[in-house]
Amino acid sequence: MSYRRETRETLVVVELVPGAVAQVETPIPFLTHMVETFLFYAGLGGRVYAEEKRRLDDGHHVIEDVAIALGRALDQLIGDRSAVARYGWAAVPMDDAFALAAVDLGGRPYWVVKAKLPNVAIGGYPLPMFPHWVRSLASEARATIHIYARGRDPHHKVEAAHKALGLALRAAVSPASGVQSTKGVLK
């Protein structure tokens, strides 16, 4: 599945291929690293390309637009949700950090991120943008995402969260027979 988002600020192209190797290129090194990490643990590959057409801020538009495009491509890939497990969760320790992530692909966007992150940037990525990235991804993928991360090293907390989110998504999209809802429909 692919999605292209072009605004005055950014150009983002996402092409998702299950089981392939991910090629990620963004102008923000830490964002590139986190998207590669998320896709690897989700069992997804393909291509994510982002460019900043004009510099307006600290990367906010690039980070947000990558999450929007990735969420829309995921929504297309998941389809009508009639044959997926729907729920997935994972716990990931990474040195001092520990992250839990849970995903519901029931079609209702919601997000919770509980992680104390300092107001600093790592590799051009302002850490206060992480909850916004999750919100944008959840909204466009029509998913509920809960992430809880703790630890001393903020890099490790955010990376463990991306690993856990990828693993949770991999579980949620695993094959299932029939619609996973007592209502009989996921919309």
From Swiss-Prot:
Supply the EC number(s): 4.2.1.19
**Which keywords does UniProt give here?**
Amino-acid biosynthesis, Cytoplasm, Histidine biosynthesis, Lyase
Q: In which pathway does it act?
A: Amino-acid biosynthesis; L-histidine biosynthesis; L-histidine from 5-phospho-alpha-D-ribose 1-diphosphate: step 6/9
Q: Which PROSITE patterns match?
A: IGP_DEHYDRATASE_2
Q: Which GO CC annotations does the UniProt entry carry?
A: cytoplasm
Gene3D superfamilies tied to this protein: Imidazole glycerol phosphate dehydratase, domain 1
A Pfam match is: IGPD
Which domain of life does this protein belong to? Archaea
Where would you find this protein in the cell?
Cytoplasm
Q: Give the SUPFAM superfamilies listed for this entry.
A: Ribosomal protein S5 domain 2-like
Give one GO biological process term.
Answer: L-histidine biosynthetic process
Q: Which GO terms describe its molecular function?
A: imidazoleglycerol-phosphate dehydratase activity
Q: Reaction catalysed by this chain?
A: D-erythro-1-(imidazol-4-yl)glycerol 3-phosphate = 3-(imidazol-4-yl)-2-oxopropyl phosphate + H2O
Family to which the UniProt record says this protein belongs? Belongs to the imidazoleglycerol-phosphate dehydratase family.
Designated name of the protein: Imidazoleglycerol-phosphate dehydratase
What species does this protein belong to?
A: Pyrobaculum calidifontis (strain DSM 21063 / JCM 11548 / VA1)
